[in-house]
């Protein structure tokens, strides 16, 4: 389902709220929501440190919640909104979950799996391709990451 820019902005703001939860826990602040028919069916935020599990990325949490909501591993007719470009692992999971549309805020130059380093979501060699849109609220999404890294440097300096 195509969403207007106003609707897309609302959903990305919801993803930013999820990222803020991670920031409050000193986790890398990435947030994600999955939307179907205008309703958020999955939410997630980074929780690797808290859970001691490497796979507890925002997208993975949101996919798990959306799978439970739908009672199906296939998340057809959904859109995933995430504050930072999905990493390689999350891009693979997005494809496996059959999510057809991803909208992200800021690029991930270090480990991006959608555009920056790898193009997993659009690779024609794979059996599922995803429509990718980038740059929605990019400055806001980048700013929360910059805040996290600035706070980390301050903690190191003061310890």
Swiss-Prot record:
Binds 1 zinc ion per subunit. It catalyses: adenosine(34) in tRNA + H2O + H(+) = inosine(34) in tRNA + NH4(+). Disulfide bonds: none annotated. The keyword Chloroplast does not apply. Its cofactor is Zn(2+). Keywords: Hydrolase, Metal-binding, tRNA processing, Zinc. InterPro entries: APOBEC/CMP_deaminase_Zn-bd (IPR016192), CMP_dCMP_dom (IPR002125), Cytidine_deaminase-like (IPR016193), tRNA_aden_deaminase (IPR028883). PROSITE patterns: CYT_DCMP_DEAMINASES_1, CYT_DCMP_DEAMINASES_2. Zn(2+) binds at residues 57, 87, 90. HAMAP family: tRNA_aden_deaminase. PANTHER family: CYTOSINE DEAMINASE FAMILY MEMBER, TRNA-SPECIFIC ADENOSINE DEAMINASE. Catalyzes the deamination of adenosine to inosine at the wobble position 34 of tRNA(Arg2). This is tRNA-specific adenosine deaminase. It comes from Streptococcus pyogenes serotype M18 (strain MGAS8232). The gene is tadA.
């Amino acid at each position: 389902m195509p969403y207007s820019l106003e609707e897309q902005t609302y959903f990305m703001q919801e993803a930013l709220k999820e990222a803020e939860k991670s920031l409050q826990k000193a986790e890398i602040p990435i947030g994600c929501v999955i939307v179907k028919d205008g309703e958020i069916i999955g939410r997630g935020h980074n929780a690797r440190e808290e859970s001691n599990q490497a796979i507890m990325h925002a997208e993975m949490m949101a996919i798990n919640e959306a799978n439970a909501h739908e009672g199906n591993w296939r998340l057809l007719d959904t859109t995933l909104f995430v504050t930072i470009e999905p990493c390689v692992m999350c891009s693979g999971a997005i494809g496996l979950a059959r999510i057809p549309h991803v909208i992200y805020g800021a690029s991930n130059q270090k480990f991006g799996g959608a555009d920056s380093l790898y193009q997993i979501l659009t690779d024609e060699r794979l059996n599922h391709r995803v429509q990718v849109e980038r740059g929605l609220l990019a400055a806001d999404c980048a700013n929360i990451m910059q805040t996290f890294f600035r706070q980390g440097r301050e903690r190191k300096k003061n310890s």
